Amino acid sequence: MTIRGLQQKVAAALNKVEALVQHGCKVFAEDMLTVQDALNSAVATAGKIAVVVVTPRFERDASGCTDGFPSGCELRVACIEAPAQRSKRNGFTALDAAETVAHALDSDSIEWRSIDQTADERRGVVTATAEFGLTIILTNPTERN
C-alpha cells in the first residue's frame, strides 16, 4: 500500500462513521486538502468539524520483501473545530470527533495511542488529534499493479 492509498482508505472509512456524518464532519486525506483548506471548508459550512488524515512518519521495520518494505507507521487524524462550532451549546467538539475516530479505527491492525488537543486562541480554532500506530507493506507509488 502507498502512503496516499493508506490516507485515502482511512478517510473513506471515517466518512462512513455514523456519528461523524451525523454531526457534519467531513474527512479528507492529507493529499486531497491542506489543513488550512480543511479549516476554511469547516468555517464555510457554518461551523462544522474538518477531519484530516495525515501520516507524518514511516519507519522501515525489516528488509524489503517482494512487494515492498514492511514499515511501522504513525497515523494521525486531526479534527479541526471552527470557532462557530465551539459556541454551539452542547455542540459536537473536536475532542468528541477525535474520541469517535479513536473508537472507530482502533482494531487488531491499527493501535490507538493517544489524543492531543491544542488551541489557537488568536483564531479560536481547536484541534484534537488522535494518533495510531500500524504496520503496512509500503509499496512504490510509481509501480502500479
What is each model feature region?
Residues D61-S63, Q85-R89:
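Short, solvent-exposed secondary-structure capping/transition elements
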Residues M1-C65:
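Small/polar-rich, solvent-exposed N-terminal microdomains that initiate assembly or binding
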Residues L20-Q22, G47-I49, G91-N145:
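Acidic-leaning, charged glycine-interspersed low-complexity segments
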Residues T66-P70, R89-D96:
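"Short basic amphipathic alpha-helical interaction patches in structured regions
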Residues V10, L14, V27, V51-V53, ...:
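Hydrophobic beta-strand residues in large extracellular and virion-surface proteins
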Residues D67-Q85, V126-N140:
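Oligomerization/assembly interface segments of phage tail-like spikes and tubes
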Residues P56-G72, T142-N145:
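Hydrophobic transmembrane alpha-helix bundles
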